[in-house]
Amino acid sequence: MAGISGSASSGGVYATKTQGGLTVTGLSKSFGKTRANDDISVRLIPGEVTALIGHNGAGKTTFLNQIVGLTRPDAGSIMHDGTDLITHPAQARQVCAIMPQVTSSLEGVTPRQAIATAVRIRGLKSKQAQRAVQETLDTLDLGDWADRPGHKLSGGIKRLTSFGMAVTAPAPIYLFDEPTNDVDPVRRELLWTMLRRRAEQGATVLIVTHNLLEVERHADRYLLFNKGRLVRDEPTSALGLAEAKSTLSITATPEFLQELRSVLDVKTSSSLGNMPDTEYIEKRIEDDSSIPREFTVTLSTDALELALPHVLSGIRAGCVESYRIGSASLADNYEEMINHD
């Protein structure tokens, strides 16, 4: 059952901020010729919420599975309170609570029953378990679905139930693999509230996610994986929306776009993403420079700040019909971060 990983630690308490945590050294794992994790060394600290980000296939899930003892590394160590969890996988399952990427089916059980079963397996007595389960249901605003059969639940409610199965009982270490997938925006905030609460109680919290804005808002620190390697380990204050890219969709004449590109080429060294090249723009001008065309370009924040005054001038001059700004794809933002290293 998702979210269950052995019994609770002695006494059923969270780790204190002066003990616990994880020290990973030289962790490597290959599947055939694919290097899933490549010489990863990192210290995960009690009391912190750490986000693990990176492209699909970057090695994030493999990293979690090695911590909890589901996958054995080829090399390296994972130390917790003086014990190498690689050579003591039973201890890993005892100290770690994990929410896997795959959502539990919940066939034949309600959210209340599923969470209660998980916390009892982790060592909570009946009355303790009942109180803890109710607290989770209340915090995640699951009251309306608490006693509804699993086959009648939406994907988001099932996902929150799997999260509750992992987070409710005390554990020194919590591992979550994309817990906010399929979850509505309001309950995403409630989920992060529970993660923060566990960290404040002294637990070590590691969450895999693809939502950079949530990482910046809620996590203390982020780890960036790329091709199996840890390429960044920084406080989230260093993540900065300044690094995030945006999309500028603009309906304008090709001639105006050429002028805009010239301005950005001269005044910024930032990546212009998929801004049409000069040859492409000149071909559109040859076709008919007076016909507005829609272009969508990806720009770094500083390039966007330079572009907007010219776009507004273009509107006044009749060269720009409309524009809109949106968030660039996660892939674009990851590429920007990775290319800086």
Predicted feature locations:
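Conserved ABC ATPase "signature" region
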Residues: A116, R120, K127-W145
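Conserved ABC ATPase signature
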Residues: P149-L153
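Helix-to-loop junction immediately C-terminal to a conserved catalytic motif
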Residues: V68
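Conserved ABC transporter NBD signature motif
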Residues: G76-T87, Q91-A92
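ABC transporter nucleotide-binding domain
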Residues: R196-T298
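Catalytic Walker B motif of ABC-type/P-loop ATPase nucleotide-binding domains
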Residues: Y174-E178
